[in-house]
Amino acid sequence: MVDNQVSAAVIIGIAKTQDKQEAFIQVFHTLCQSMEKVSYDIKDFVYQEEPFSISIKNSIFKKHYIHIEDSKLSTVIDLELDMPLHIQTTKYAPTIMGPFAYLKNMQCNHAILNLESQTHGYMKYQNQIYNIQGIIYQEKDWGNSFPKKYIWVQSNCCLQKKQFYFYRVPQFH
C-alpha cells in the first residue's frame, strides 16, 4: 500500500517445518522503519477460496477489504479497495506462471490477486490516525519452498496510462 504519507507491506501466511507450524502476520511500514511479526496457532488461519477471504483472529483479508488488528502489533490498518485490476487469464496462462501453473510438483507457485487498485481507509500507529488515499497490490505464493534467489520489480506510482511489463528468468538446478 502506498500513499503520500506512508507505504506499507503486509505478509500473511503459514510456515511449516518439521518441528513447528504457525500462521503469521508481518507488517512493515515507513513510519517505524522496522518489521513486526505476530505468530498464531495454525488453526487461527481460516481460508475461503470463493469469495476469497482469509482471517487470522481479528484480522481479515478480502478481495475488497483489509483489516489488520492485534494487540501485539503497534499498527492497525483498515482499507477498502476499489476497482481491482486483474490480469486476464486464459487456458494457456491461468495465472502469472503461464503453463507452469498446471504442474502439480512445483515447489513454489505464484499468482497476482490484484495488480493495482485504489484504496482508502486509515492506518493507526502510536495513537495517531493516518487517512489513506493510495494504491495497493496483492499477490499470493504457495508451495513447499521459496526460491533462494529472485528478483521482483514493480512500480505503480506512474503519472501516465497504466502499462505493465513482465520479465522472468527461471533458474533451474
Stretches found by the model and what they are:
Residues 1-173:
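Structured soluble/peripheral alpha/beta segments that form catalytic or ligand/cofactor-binding pockets
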